Amino acid sequence: METCLMRCSHGGIALFRALKPPRNVKLPNSLRLSSMALHTDGGRSVKRAYDALLLDAGGTLLQLAKPVEETYATIGSKYGLSMTSAEIKQGFRRAFAAPWPEKLCYQGDGRPFWKLVVSEATGCADDDYFEEVYEYYAKGDAWHLPDGAYETIVLLKDAGGHIHKVFSSICYLLVLMKSMVFELFSSFIIPNMMSCDTVKVAVVSNFDTRLRKLLKELNVLDLFDAVIISSEVGYEKPDIKIFKAALDQLNAEACKAVHIGDDQKADKVGANAIGVDCWLWGIDVKTFSDIGNRMLISES
């Protein structure tokens, strides 16, 4: 089927381009592709376990290049900070355990929250110290992706994608030509082409407005179908509204989505509350290869 469509597409796409269809041409509802489809990957039949993948950012998709306490101690030495890395680490635990008076921790650029955290963790209220630390974590060099993250996301998004492009072109061509072949195509070929849509991937994170810049610097921003940031939408995990915002943007059903995160309450409890499965990073899945293997299941 795939080989046939690829051969047919060369002439079909040329004619399709010559017709110059308008951008707003819509396909009939019968052409909308269903989920949980089969596709071929290197001669191997694969089934998608989920239609959508939601990823937490900090601690999951984004890993620190160096332990935060070491960075704070190194930068702090220029401002007279004498605390050890171990002491700063303990200070961070106290800071994050303390109640935050506002509805959201991350509002806008998150400066008020982070300023309180830095001051509580280090005992240093120097504005210049805070600004240097804040700007350090606004740069991609302070973070890295887990091994295999980029490749796995590309693999999931490309699942069946090359067929999808050919399939879409042929559909548009037949609709525009009002071809009699369309009925045959619709009745017999479409049911076997349910592999054409791919896994949708979104970031769902409690983060401030630096996140998009970080994802861009790490060359992954364009990989995502949606980026849902708490400081932008006004909800923080575990609030189900932030997960709903992601599902709505992806046009995905909760029962056909899985969320990956590292926090039991924010990620697992929040996702499960809206009917989304959750795999805890470091427990249920430890690598992005694990995620890929659970998302795409080989058919025997």
Label for each model-derived stretch:
Residues 2-51, 86, 128, 150-159, ...:
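Asp-based, Mg2+/Mn2+-dependent phosphohydrolase catalytic module
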Residues 20, 25-159, 173-177, 183-184, ...:
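N-terminal helical cap/lid subdomain that shapes the substrate entry/recognition surface
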